[in-house]
């Protein structure tokens, strides 16, 4: 049962991060979250409009 709870928690966190990145994708270049010894870095690749 604890493994199932951990898996559900991980899925919720991943979906939340994906939704956040999707909502601010036009103004977000990079995201860095740090909690204890864990660091999550997300960087978006984009091309400059000419």
From Swiss-Prot:
Organism (species): Escherichia coli
Function text: Toxic component of a type I toxin-antitoxin (TA) system. When expressed is involved in cellular Mg(2+) release and degradation of stable RNA.
Name of the protein in its database record: Protein PndA
Primary residence: membrane
Pfam families per UniProt: HOK_GEF (PF01848)
InterPro entries: Hok/gef_toxin, Hok/gef_toxin_CS
Membrane topology term: Single-pass membrane protein
Key word Transmembrane helix present: yes
UniProt gene name: pndA
